[in-house]
């Protein structure tokens, strides 16, 4: 990444919540929403992905999906090894379970 950002713009009609592609984007979205007068999670829920440090420095702290990085790496290495050894490779999608880490940016109703 080169450190540049595509500016976030808020929609006219706000959804009940946002699911962001990473915690850094979720952090920036929370800041923008708060500046616009929204309360997180009372008005709008926000979740991130990757359970990065941004999830805990954000106020309120972000609910995030914790990725099993070791599991993803092991799955990739195993598929690559099978392919390099001429063995059959399963379907191109491999599911690696993760965990939802519930924090303050969402409300369980």
Model-derived features: where do they sit?
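Short beta-strand elements in bilobed, periplasmic/extracellular small-molecule ligand-binding domains
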Residues: 1-4
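Flexible loop/turn connectors
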Residues: 7-109
């Amino acid at each position: 990444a080169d450190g540049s950002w595509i500016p976030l713009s808020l929609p006219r009609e706000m959804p009940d919540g946002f699911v962001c592609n990473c915690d850094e984007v979720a952090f920036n979205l929370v800041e923008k929403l708060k500046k616009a007068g929204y309360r997180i999670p009372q008005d709008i829920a926000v979740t991130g992905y990757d359970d990065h440090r941004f999830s805990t420095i954000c106020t309120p702290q972000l609910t995030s999906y914790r990725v099993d990085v070791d599991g993803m790496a092991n799955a990739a290495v195993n598929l690559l090894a099978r392919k390099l050894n001429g063995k059959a490779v399963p379907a191109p999608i491999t599911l690696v379970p993760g965990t939802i880490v519930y924090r303050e940016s969402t409300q369980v109703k």
